[in-house]
UniProtKB/Swiss-Prot annotation:
Coiled coil: none annotated. CDD domains: Ribosomal_L7_L12. GO terms for cellular component: cytosolic large ribosomal subunit. Homodimer. Part of the ribosomal stalk of the 50S ribosomal subunit. Forms a multimeric L10(L12)X complex, where L10 forms an elongated spine to which 2 to 4 L12 dimers bind in a sequential fashion. Binds GTP-bound translation factors. It comes from Aeromonas hydrophila subsp. hydrophila (strain ATCC 7966 / DSM 30187 / BCRC 13018 / CCUG 14551 / JCM 1027 / KCTC 2358 / NCIMB 9240 / NCTC 8049). This is Large ribosomal subunit protein bL12. The gene is rplL.
Amino acid sequence: MSITKDQIIEAVASMSVMEVVELIEAMEEKFGVSAAAAVMAGPAAAEAVEEKTEFDVVLTAAGANKVAVIKAVRGATGLGLKEAKDLVEAAPANLKEAVSKDEAEALKKELEAAGASVEIK
């Protein structure tokens, strides 16, 4: 006499939660498997977004202390006084393009300390 799938489903449906947990544990031991969900490694994992390696530092506003910002821009870019002043007054403007994340963060920190508003894109 064999048991049908429907009979097994009915038997499990009538069990308490603790009984179902015990049944699952017994089945894991008997068949050497785990009831944990299998992780599918497929094309979705291969299409993961690549981490950006080059960043642009954009001066969005000079802030109240424009002189300090101009000095910081001169030091960071190597521009002359007039060019740095024109760049600061033309905000929003790209200060540096295609720089590393560390360099972009350092430049942002330096300019914000001088009173500027800076974005990294």
